[in-house]
Amino acid sequence: MAVFATQRLYIGGGYVDATSGETFDTLDPATGETLASVQQASAADVDRAVRSAKQGQREWAALTAMQRSRILRRAVDLLRERNDELAALETRDTGKPIAETLAVDIVTGADVIEYYAGLATAIEGQQIPLRPTSFVYTRREPLGVCAGIGAWNYPIQIACWKSAPALAAGNAMIFKPSEITPLSALKLAEIFTEAGVPAGVFNVVQGDGRVGAMLAAHPDIEKISFTGGVETGKKVMSMAGASSLKEVTMELGGKSPLLVFDDANLERAADIATSANFFSSGQVCTNGTRVFVQRGVLDRFEALVLERVKRIRVGKPTDAATNFGPLVSAAQLHKVLGYIESGKQEGARLVAGGKRLTEGHFAGGQYVEPTVFADCRDDMRIVREEIFGPVMSILVFDDEDEAIARANHTAYGLAAGVVTENLARAHRVIHRLEAGICWINTWGESPAEMPVGGYKQSGVGRENGITTLEHYTRIKSVQVELGPYQPVF
């Protein structure tokens, strides 16, 4: 029997039944227990959501920027008031440790909405003089109806990241969460409605990739913001362009390098590498999974990482002491185990982990040990391909130029990091790394103020930061003539 009632769609400010007649189950990754049956949206449901969004968007855009800002701030207050209950729901649906969801997922999502609520009143145009009797002014106008397609690793945070700039700029958003973690986006919809966001301005349509394709191809949607894998992102981008030349934002995969130089504080470097690989059980798109270590400090670094891996507390996500939970699904577990086996077969040396955990309370869950491979080569699958799990690959390098060249030798370009005590080297290397998000002597923080996104096949456009708000508007140019019109004929 499911823990929660059947989950419906959220359209027009309230819950409605899907017309498809289809449902799917969402499971607790820690136990395998069915959390809820979720209704699958049909094409008719997507059309209904679009009609609702168009109507709501007109009302929302007609408000002043200050009015929109106040409503979004009320939503922030509600998110923070309900942080603990939302974190508990997110833990059940994703398998993340409660210590993590309490401190990160809802907190950072609320921060982003608060950030854009503050920027809503700063949207402005320009005045451009042409001559004494004529000038141009520009207006930044909302796009209209936008769609967000979320990933399963940060369900409510991603919903906040995508909806905040869209709504602040006067748009409506139809959001499709991942079918693997579909619960918390509905709670965000409830909160937006309670805060005073007009009906239809934030709709949630549940379902698998068919629903994402419907959104990408819909002619009345002006923009798609997608978070997920590269291959799916390419399909979404193709459909978005072919249907109506939609604007797109793509936050895709990565195989990010972390460079540890021989002058680094190795204790700090080991802390950074461990966090960059095992936070959220390694299910983070920016993970620094390719750890390049300068030869002279390789053995010491490896020993320090092993010390830290031994301190990781794998356990029930609901236990406050746990800091490493299960993978999100059986499919993800088997994918990760397949990569671990590949690493062994290709000759990498297993330093730590590598096995599924099945004893005791791990029996029903999707648990795998934090895994570290050393003696890795650039041509190994575990080094080349995104695993999206707790698998660290340690590689050795001799000099700066070599490290940079190898770090950049990838189709991805999402994130990169450098650990060194040499300030000049830190900036010199970072400036040559082909990645959109970079860290020096730290890893992983993505505050609301910081634009995040990738180079190469890791994405298009950015999320967060001022620049993202601009991409949820379009510019209208208006020329005004104060003098007589000069006829051509």
Curated annotation (Swiss-Prot):
Reactions catalysed, as given in the entry: betaine aldehyde + NAD(+) + H2O = glycine betaine + NADH + 2 H(+)
Species annotation: Paraburkholderia phytofirmans (strain DSM 17436 / LMG 22146 / PsJN)
Assembly and oligomerization: Dimer of dimers.
GO biological-process terms attached to the record: glycine betaine biosynthetic process from choline
Any coiled-coil regions, as ranges: none
Function of the molecule: Involved in the biosynthesis of the osmoprotectant glycine betaine. Catalyzes the irreversible oxidation of betaine aldehyde to the corresponding acid.
Modified residues (Cysteine sulfenic acid (-SOH)): 285
Binding sites annotated in the UniProt record for NAD(+): 150-152, 176-179, 229-232, 253, 285, 386
Seems to be a necessary countercharge to the potassium cations, annotated site positions: 247
Gene it is expressed from: betB
Annotated catalytic residues: 162, 251, 285, 463
Binding of K(+) 1, residues: 26, 93, 180
Secretion signal span: none
Disulfide bonds: none
Similarity comment text for this entry: Belongs to the aldehyde dehydrogenase family.
Descriptive protein name: Betaine aldehyde dehydrogenase
SUPFAM superfamilies registered for this protein in UniProt: ALDH-like
Names of the cofactor(s): K(+)
Any one GO molecular-function label of the UniProt entry: betaine-aldehyde dehydrogenase (NAD+) activity
Residues at which K(+) 2 binds: 245, 456, 459
Cofactor: how and how many bound: Binds 2 potassium ions per subunit.
